[in-house]
Amino acid sequence: MKTVEIYTDGACKKNPGPGGWGAILIYGKNEKEIYGGELDTTNNRMELMAAIEALRALKQGCKVELYTDSQYVRKGITEWMQNWIKKGWRTSGGDPVKNVDLWQALDKERNKHDISWRWVKGHSGHPLNERADELANLGVKEALGETG
């Protein structure tokens, strides 16, 4: 099974507003950068999209070290999701889970891989997290039609 490192980030100008996601996938000496954006979204949705699209980019099941600066994503996948599923995608308070469409997509993708979810402090100078942030901001620009 291949081992892949993934660094993800999401960005949003205003929240909600135009947003973008970015990810870097590293396998050995090979790197792949992906990004995208949406005109009307939230930062949390873009953080989720970064992880979903990065995992979708893998052509086969892999051992993955996925780094995110989003506690929402990391805690959601490692602590909260199991109970959400048991409760029919409801929170402990009985409310519908926010962004359930993306959580369900992430759940589907994560089941294809052996993933270790890692947290990295955002904007702390970590080079690969900073690159993921740059890609997310490119996604915002693309959504706004500002890329040339």
UniProtKB/Swiss-Prot annotation:
PROSITE patterns, per the entry: RNASE_H_1
Cross-referenced Gene3D superfamilies: Ribonuclease H-like superfamily/Ribonuclease H
Record-listed E.C. numbers: 3.1.26.4
First-listed, main subcellular location of the protein, grouped into a coarse class: cytoplasm
Record field: catalytic activity: Endonucleolytic cleavage to 5'-phosphomonoester
Cofactor: Mg(2+)
Record: residues binding Mg(2+) 2: 9, 133
Residue positions binding Mg(2+) 1: 9, 47, 69
Keywords: Cytoplasm, Endonuclease, Hydrolase, Magnesium, Metal-binding, Nuclease
Subunit field text: Monomer.
HAMAP family in the record: RNase_H
Family to which this protein belongs: Belongs to the RNase H family.
Protein name: Ribonuclease H
Gene transcribed to yield this protein: rnhA
